[in-house]
Amino acid sequence: MESCWLLTVDTGSTAHGSDNLMLDLQPPSFEAFEREARQGNVVPVVRSVLADLHTPVGAFMRIAGDSTYSFLLESVEGGERIARYSFLGAEPEMIVRGKGLQTIVERDGKTESYLKVATEWVRDYFRGRSLAHRPGLVPFAGGAVGYIGYDAAQWFEPALRDDNTQPLDPPTDAVWMFFRNVIAFDRVKQRLEIVSIVLTEEAGGSHERLRELYDRAVARTKELEDRIFETPAAPRVETRNDNAESVALQSNWTRRAFEDGVREVKEHIAAGDCYQVVLSQRFSAQFDGDPLQIYRALRAINPSPYMFFLRLGDETVVGASPEMLVRCHGQRLDYRPIAGTRKRGATETEDWMLGEDLKTDEKEIAEHMMLVDLGRNDLGRVSDYGSVKVDDLMHVERYSHVQHLETSLRSRLRDGLDRFDALASCFPAGTVTGAPKIRAMEIIRELEPDRRGLYAGSVLYMDYADNLDSCIAIRTMVLRDGKAMVQAGAGIVADSVPEHEYVETVNKARAMFRAIEMAERGL
């Protein structure tokens, strides 16, 4: 099991189907569409075109334009694998926001409010809607894309909820965009799969209305194809400042306060309250440029398994996360904790030696095994008894700049439960809280000066086939009101040195802000 959005394949794969010889594959006939509609009430209409001269970022620039709601998901991996698919979309049919214990829904020009947590509202929306099966359909053919912030943990864990302190106008804890039209880049076949789904319930049993919905979906796929292939390429962004200086960062902690916080965590550990707590600080800098240029820069300097660019109205989220939260595909659950880091070596020999040093570092091993056990417990709460398995224990996974210790966990989701139960059980990841998880989160709430917001939450998608894929929102930047914000944490244990932990968080954040510096100098 690989850690990335959706699928990975060997770079030497020969899985090029005969359809790859066709320049343009038209959507299925209405008769074929009707047959598929008997298998599910969410039916995909797909147009497939050769796309060997296009890139996901270029297509996104053509499709999204100035759209205030859009997304791009990519897996940009090095080494011996490439990620097969990239996904993008714009102009969602519906926006769902979770604000405290209520849900705000925007659709058809109207805004409605529900006294229900957002995950329950979204679960109810998907219930009864099922994707018609089609062999070869791309893994994500429409559904919800967005994020759920760290503070939404109160939705899943009563011990973290304090109903007496709920604000009248709570901040946004989660945002999902619902898309009927999705574009998938298939790197293996060098094709563009343009998908438009039809919800047959909207036909109201009318054959004529169903035909109208089908025709509209076909026309939509053609319109999207034309926008990609006929719209002039976006001009190269000109350099604004060849002598741009390093970004000036501001933190929500003073250095002294953060280091005192580390000491308080160590006191909790000495008292037996916890084994580890991840203490974080938020850095911000001024930025009034185009966030997409930050994504392009981040893609170049920090390629990662989970790359994402989300336009969400008044905010934009840009990230390059290395770590899965949880994946639910059918009844299978996957979880992949990461803990333990070394830099990449300058030579193959040095690289190997650094990896071996990581694998034999007792402190790194102890921390990693603590998080593996926490992950096994999280999966075990929603899985068949005895189904939680450990694969590739403490495997060294190499990325562009660093190598990590990683372990793959898998299990079978218990009958009667669904992906929302899996998400609730694993959220947030132990790698961004500490252990025991609930007590660590209580200490975080006591010590950190502000709510975490998106940081340490998850960026995710959910489709109409009951699948979920999610990553941990680390190495993530939120852009809003002329500011770019990055949060970074350090895992505090009994022998942590406060000064070192402070420097670690600064260095992690600075690595993200280098993308701003690159964007401001010009790409």
Residue ranges with predicted function:
Residues 21-523:
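Extended alpha-helical targeting/anchoring segments
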Residues 7-10, 219:
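N-terminal non-cleavable signal-anchor helices
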